[in-house]
Regions:
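Hydrophobic core segments of beta-strands in well-ordered, beta-rich domains
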Residues: 1-5, 10-23, 76-82, 86
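Acidic, glycine-rich loop-and-beta core segments that form the ion-binding/anion-interacting portion
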Residues: 7-8, 20-42
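Beta-rich accessory regions
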Residues: 31-183
Length: 183
């Protein structure tokens, strides 16, 4: 599933190199999402000129097969597949496995590729449609966080009396969000 997009005239090759040795680059997914940034692209030989080293696009363990394209306005947009075919999920018993991610806009900054949900996602949140045939869940909500730059934070969801639950860590210095389901 290789994809080539351009950001500010720089070619970005996105791909999932199955079987890549972790000696080349450490990753936590059996089908890693990777990318290289080229200085330019040789269309006659289908080659990146002066490519960067291979880099992780996504550190998630269930995310792969990113599909990207340049929109008519020039933005580089992408969606990724969430859920791996070789992994069993609780939803398998309902004949459902996997889903596409939100549409993301890709940007370059200091030689790294960044992914941000497209702003149009907010337009979808404005309208609500109640489903009267569904039972209400007390574990569903939307949480908007405003965190100061260069800080670290943790929230724990669905915690039991011992504080064990789904831990979400925000490291704004490193630009990483970590989800820990081990407790």
């Amino acid at each position: 599933c290789p994809n080539l997009v351009f950001i500010n005239d720089q070619p970005i090759l996105l791909y999932c190199p199955q079987g890549l040795s972790k000696d080349v680059l450490d990753y936590g997914n059996i089908y890693p999402n990777m990318y290289k940034i080229g200085q330019s692209f040789d269309i006659n030989n289908a080659a990146l000129i002066n490519p960067s080293p291979i880099q992780n696009l996504d550190f998630g363990f269930d995310c792969y097969a990113t599909q990207a394209f340049n929109a008519p306005d020039g933005r580089a947009l992408a969606v990724s597949w969430l859920g791996l075919p070789d992994v069993e999920y609780p939803s398998d018993r309902f004949d459902h496995q996997g889903v596409f991610s939100l549409v993301k806009e890709l940007t370059l900054k200091d030689g790294k590729l960044y992914q941000y949900p497209v702003p149009a996602i907010k337009d979808l949140q404005a309208a609500s449609q109640p489903f009267t045939s569904l039972s209400e869940s007390k574990n569903s909500y939307e949480l908007e966080l405003n965190l100061a730059a260069d800080t670290e934070h943790e929230i724990v969801l669905f915690a039991d009396k011992d504080g064990k639950g789904l831990r979400i860590n925000f490291d704004l210095k490193a630009g990483q969000v970590t989800v820990d389901r081990s407790q």
